[in-house]
Amino acid sequence: MSAIVDIFAREILDSRGNPTVECDVLLESGVMGRAAVPSGASTGQKEALELRDGDKSRYSGKGVLKAVEHVNNQIAQALIGIDANEQSYIDQIMIELDGTENKGNLGANATLAVSMAVARAAAEDSGLPLYRYLGGAGPMSLPVPMMNVINGGEHANNSLNIQEFMIMPVGAKSFREALRCGAEIFHALKKLCDSKGFPTTVGDEGGFAPNLNSHKEALQLMVEATEAAGYKAGEDVLFALDCASSEFYKDGKYHLEAEGRSYTNAEFAEYLEGLVNEFPIISIEDGMDENDWEGWKLLTEKLGGRVQLVGDDLFVTNPKILAEGIEKGVANALLVKVNQIGTLSETLKAVDLAKRNRYASVMSHRSGETEDSTIADLAVATNCMQIKTGSLSRSDRMAKYNQLLRIEEELAEAADYPSKAAFYQLGK
């Protein structure tokens, strides 16, 4: 039987040493599902609430004992006895139990931990891997990875405002080959940084955080590292940026302190267009502030036909906000972060809405991660065709990549690696 007989949460630590919620769900059959929740550094204003204790005497106020208590009491009482296969029903019970738009009572970290653990338990009970349990028996694609090799912004203590500089191995024939390509470029970049006297310490997501004079210098380093590893930038490898523009948008201007310049939204769109013209950039995330819809419209009109424009802080994995963006014709891709919305069911709804409107989806980690690899299975289950889960270092990032290797091995000949077809909204 797949009825839930026990739900138990605990406080564990994430990759930054901050508390987060882990949950175990036990079924009548004796199987157990376990899941842990990630946490972001640069967060969208409209994200579901991550409930923290606020007690400055514990973990500087970042404890999650209240969220744990909500799981072990209200949520457990509401869900024990329900069939774990009823994922949508279970998630809806938690949504109604919380009673707010942003999971403000129970905390999205509480509801998501339970939601993911229920899915894992149900998959185990059915004898299926999680990606098959959630994705069904149809054909599946492994995702093209966005590998964060240079960190800036909120993810590093350096001079760069743009938060992530990523490589995408589009010339690979398999995920295994793509991972090898990324790792070889990562190590070539480390040697290059070392030779130029830059520190080779890594940021929150495993990328290097050199103190550079400009964003162009970071992109040029990536070109050099790609070539040093034996690959061609623009053919084997394309670049992606996460601007996280909301972090440097103040008083109606985009302030690039590293370059000593401030831009209006029209000027910043031109700045980004200049980078696209000079470097092989295929994807730009959060190119405008989350509330600058005018700027997003300008950017989409300027670059949306040839570059993937990803809404993260803009859409916060929320189907209602995504629907508004689709109606207004802004961006052309959705970044998918399960903890932005707080349940698996709502996450899957957002991905489905994006697909139906020819918006690409990019499954994503957070900067504060755990060893939980659920998003790897989700990327395959939803046929997202793209995943963003950090650099080629730190076990919290590699856990996702290694799970994708296992999935590709299990799927064997049925595993497709989409390469440039991952950018289907651009007609690639």
Swiss-Prot record:
Q: What is its EC number?
A: 4.2.1.11
A GO MF term: phosphopyruvate hydratase activity
Subcellular location, principal: cytoplasm
Which residues make up the binding site for Mg(2+)?
A: 242, 285, 312
Where in or outside the cell? Cytoplasm; Secreted; Cell surface
Pfam families the record matches: Enolase_C, Enolase_N
GO terms in the biological process aspect are:
glycolytic process
Q: Which reaction does it catalyse?
A: (2R)-2-phosphoglycerate = phosphoenolpyruvate + H2O
Cofactor: how bound: Binds a second Mg(2+) ion via substrate during catalysis.
The pathway to which it is assigned is: Carbohydrate degradation; glycolysis; pyruvate from D-glyceraldehyde 3-phosphate: step 4/5
Specify which residues bind (2R)-2-phosphoglycerate according to the UniProt entry for this protein: 163, 337, 366-367, 388
Bilayer-crossing residues are none
**If you read the UniProt record, what top EC class would you report for this enzyme, in one word?**
lyase
Q: Which domain of life is it from?
A: Bacteria
Known Gene3D superfamilies for this protein?
Enolase-like C-terminal domain (3.20.20.120), Enolase-like, N-terminal domain (3.30.390.10)
Q: Name one GO cellular component term.
A: cell surface
> Per its UniProt record, what CDD domains does this chain match?
enolase (cd03313)
Required co-factors: Mg(2+)
Give the keywords, sorted. Cytoplasm, Glycolysis, Lyase, Magnesium, Metal-binding, Secreted
Q: Which InterPro entries match?
A: Enolase, Enolase-like_C_sf, Enolase-like_N, Enolase_C, Enolase_CS, Enolase_N
Tell me which residues this entry annotates as catalytic. Answer: 205 (proton donor), 337 (proton acceptor)
Biological role? Catalyzes the reversible conversion of 2-phosphoglycerate (2-PG) into phosphoenolpyruvate (PEP). It is essential for the degradation of carbohydrates via glycolysis.
Could you say which protein family the record assigns here? Belongs to the enolase family.
The molecule here is called Enolase
Species of origin reads Neisseria meningitidis serogroup B (strain ATCC BAA-335 / MC58)
